[in-house]
């Protein structure tokens, strides 16, 4: 019989690890069949091991759940991750269907919103500002571009903890 209620609570160190993995490794395992599935599992595997234990049937079951099709915006993936981990931490394997529904229900809308705003709109606006200023010999545009990118990274870093706290 599977252990239904995990006892591990995520720490700031866990959140920092997930954020680093999200920024630098989320797309590394991208493939045409299931897109970001391996990247998603890569983000949360250390925490899944802490929640379910190493080499347990629960861990294996949840790993199979997390390698299903997944594709969303790189800018919003940690919102889904935070909510997912909050559910798994509270419900364990019993929350498997909830986690699957969450991922399926949010990945499409977050892909559309995140990519439209953070991959198209913001780079276009700040890139145009930076290019216009640079063409006039003004280096301030470059710093505006850098500040915008830092703000985006800060947003990405903070949304994981926010989603986790509000997730259940």
Listing of model-derived features with the role each one plays in the protein:
Residues 62, 109-117, 138, 142:
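Hydrophobic, aromatic-rich alpha-helical transmembrane segments
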Residues 18, 44, 51, 79-83, ...:
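Weak global preference for isoleucine
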Residues 67, 93, 99, 104, ...:
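Extended aliphatic helical segments
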Residues 98-132:
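Transmembrane alpha-helical segments and their cytosolic interface motifs
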Residues 1-98:
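Soluble N-terminal domains of membrane-associated systems
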Residues 83-91, 105, 124-127, 166-168:
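Short alpha-helical linear motifs
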Residues 124-125, 129-168:
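Membrane-embedded alpha-helical modules
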């Amino acid at each position: 019989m599977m252990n239904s209620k995990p006892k591990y609570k995520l720490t700031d160190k866990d959140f920092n690890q997930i954020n680093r993995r999200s920024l630098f490794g989320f797309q590394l395992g991208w493939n045409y069949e299931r897109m970001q599935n391996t990247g998603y599992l890569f983000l949360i595997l250390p925490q899944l091991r802490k929640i379910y234990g190493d080499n347990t049937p629960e861990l294996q079951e949840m790993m199979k759940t997390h390698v299903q099709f997944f594709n969303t915006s790189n800018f919003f993936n940690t919102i889904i991750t935070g909510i997912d981990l909050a559910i798994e931490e509270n419900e364990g394997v019993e929350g498997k269907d909830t986690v699957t529904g969450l991922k399926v229900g949010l990945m499409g809308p977050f892909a559309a919103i995140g990519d439209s705003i953070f991959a198209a709109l913001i780079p276009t606006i700040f890139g145009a500002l930076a290019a216009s200023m640079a063409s006039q010999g003004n280096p301030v545009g470059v710093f505006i571009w850098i500040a915008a990118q830092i703000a985006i990274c800060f947003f990405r870093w903070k949304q994981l903890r926010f989603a986790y706290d509000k997730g259940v």
